[in-house]
Amino acid sequence: MITHRSNNVQYEVTPPSVEEDLGPQFEFYWTRQKDPHSIRRKLILAKHPEVAKLCGPEWRTKYIASAVVLLQLSIAYALKNTPVLSFKFLALAYVVGATANQNCFLCIHELSHNLAFRKPLHNKLFAIWVNLPIGVPYSASFQPYHQLHHKFLGDEVLDTDLPTPLEATVLSSLLGKAFFATFQIFFYALRPMMVTSIDMTFIHLLNVLVCLVSDFILIKFGSANSLWYLILSSFFAGSLHPTAGHFIAEHYLLDPPKHYTQFQDVPPLETYSYYGMLNLFTWNVGYHNEHHDFPFIAWSKLPLLRTIAHDFYQPLPKHTSWVRVIVDFIFDENVLMYNRVKRETAKDKSVDSKTTKTQS
């Protein structure tokens, strides 16, 4: 009972049970604990030292990626006289184009880890070639930002995969999440530049120049519709498309804990894998715990890594459908833009010029 001190009226108040679900938490899941990947990597190598032999480039990558690039450029040329808003044009852009461009996005992801060639420069140059069907320059900037994501997972400043506080505040409603899921490609393209700066290099300039020349040639010998096909393919690949589910599935908490004390509780699992058939089109990016544990193992050997270290990966929660991930993300009221594990940037944690220059 509580008695109001001015009118002596008594109120009966029942405090919530410790076990009661208090609803969604409108705050990130802050922790000071180290991310689990480096810890698990050491444990796996200690128990399964043969895993180290899986590291290194995959020779087939360049041939598969080149076939996808040529497929997209061929379709773009073939659609030069097809109206952009026609069913044929939009259906091809969504079904074939988005799947192919998602493949290009994720091949560039492989190349950012130098997993197609032994020399970093060769991977960077090949990434510019794989970038052509995307329609806008992308590959040169992706690599340094993605390396920061791996090295500083969850860092409030250096991990630009994290939504900003403004995004989390504005977009955590049903409509906000639907907007984010529909236009997430723009968030992933623009957010890094607004959060963390990197040095511009000759590779960036070459990426822009080659992409512009490619677009010009495509318009000259095809038409503007040809370029629109590539742009729409890229948009659909980062929108409400089955393969786009990986963007959300990788690190968002879709089953958040009912209670969490910031900086005190053990953080929930912050990386999730998916082992379904869409990995066939996406360079096995669904093997995401495996990838973060061993970022220098190529896509083709991640299933073998999981088999060897089955005792480590089998107990981990996983997704069974990227489409289900998108649906749950939008419609589950307990899933917010805040549902990410986040870490403070330590004062002595900095990115020197060598980190950005050698990786950009």
UniProtKB/Swiss-Prot annotation:
Its EC number is 1.14.19.17
Tell me which UniProt keywords the record has, alphabetically.
Answer: Lipid metabolism, Membrane, Oxidoreductase, Sphingolipid metabolism, Transmembrane, Transmembrane helix
Q: Transmembrane stretches, by residue range?
A: 67-87, 89-109, 125-145, 170-190, 202-222, 228-248
One family name in Pfam for this protein: Lipid_DES
What chemistry does it catalyse, as a reaction equation? an N-acylsphinganine + 2 Fe(II)-[cytochrome b5] + O2 + 2 H(+) = an N-acylsphing-4-enine + 2 Fe(III)-[cytochrome b5] + 2 H2O
Q: Where is this motif: Histidine box-2?
A: 146-150
Q: Under the cellular component aspect of Gene Ontology, which terms does the record hold?
A: membrane
Family membership noted in the UniProt record: Belongs to the fatty acid desaturase type 1 family. DEGS subfamily.
Protein name (Swiss-Prot/TrEMBL): Sphingolipid delta(4)-desaturase
